[in-house]
């Protein structure tokens, strides 16, 4: 249904300063879809994420994200768009001098929550969703890497986002912890939020199939599923294993907006 379309890009050009990074980008993402974004470092993955987040301006084509027209969005509207988008980074970006509760409260205050009872209720709700209901009093350094990433996911869920952008969310985690994060992200998509995850980890794509978008040679193409619905390295000439590095790959060096735009 049209109303379920969270991302609708048609013939969009994506620039970094004066350099054309991706041309004629056409993407549709529906509510509840899980979409991988792959491609070599520097291929434009982070530039695409920045465009969806209105960090990079759209100057042509059609670009509707979470109900906002990015072609003519006003600067004062950008914070409201970003409240409908959650972002999860590879390197956590938690406030190290504040407790878990205070990290989440910081986001609530920055996005104009004011009712203390509602804030407390939502804080406990998102912590329970990520399996850390008893960790609110902890400082970030007292948590494992996987727990810190779960807190980042909880932070991204505070405003019930329509779209979750995950930029290498498992890049610093061991395989077992990565699996837990993947299961959580998949549960989020099943609950109705669209999820787009940039990754270099081929093993995750094999284990947790989803749609695949590939950035390559200035274009974004969709890699189709085979008849069984699984993705492999050999079913299509569009998917090459050199597009996916091993788990030690740290992903793109193009940063997304600091502090998730708050």
Predicted features and spans:
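Conserved ABC ATPase signature
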Residues: 139-143, 147
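A short, proline-enriched helix->beta-strand linker immediately N-terminal to the Walker B motif
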Residues: 158-162
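Short coil-to-helix segment of the ABC ATPase nucleotide-binding domain corresponding to the Q-loop/switch region
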Residues: 98-106
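Conserved ABC transporter NBD signature motif
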Residues: 61-69
């Amino acid at each position: 249904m049209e109303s379920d379309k969270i991302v609708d890009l048609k013939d969009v050009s994506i620039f970094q300063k004066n350099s054309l990074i991706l041309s004629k980008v056409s993407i549709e993402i529906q509510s509840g879809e899980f979409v991988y974004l792959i491609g070599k470092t520097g291929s434009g993955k982070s530039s695409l994420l920045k465009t969806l987040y209105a960090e990079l301006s759209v100057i042509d084509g059609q670009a509707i994200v979470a109900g906002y027209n990015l072609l003519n969005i006003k600067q004062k509207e950008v914070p409201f768009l970003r409240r409908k988008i959650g972002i999860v980074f590879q390197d956590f970006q938690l406030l190290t001098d504040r407790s878990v509760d205070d990290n989440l409260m910081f986001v609530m205050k920055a996005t104009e929550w004011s009712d203390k009872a509602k804030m407390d209720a939502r804080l406990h709700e998102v912590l329970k969703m990520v399996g850390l209901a008893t960790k609110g009093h902890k400082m970030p350094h007292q948590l494992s890497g996987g727990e810190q990433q779960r807190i980042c996911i909880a932070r991204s869920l505070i405003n019930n986002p329509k779209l979750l952008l995950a930029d290498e969310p498992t890049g610093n985690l061991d395989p077992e912890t990565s699996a837990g994060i993947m299961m959580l992200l998949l549960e989020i998509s099943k609950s109705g939020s669209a999820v787009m995850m940039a990754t270099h980890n081929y093993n995750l794509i094999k284990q947790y199939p989803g749609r695949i978008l590939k950035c390559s040679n200035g274009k974004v193409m969709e890699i189709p599923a085979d008849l069984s619905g699984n993705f492999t390295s050999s079913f299509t000439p569009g998917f090459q294993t050199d597009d996916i590095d091993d788990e030690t790959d740290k992903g793109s060096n193009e940063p997304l907006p600091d502090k998730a735009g708050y």
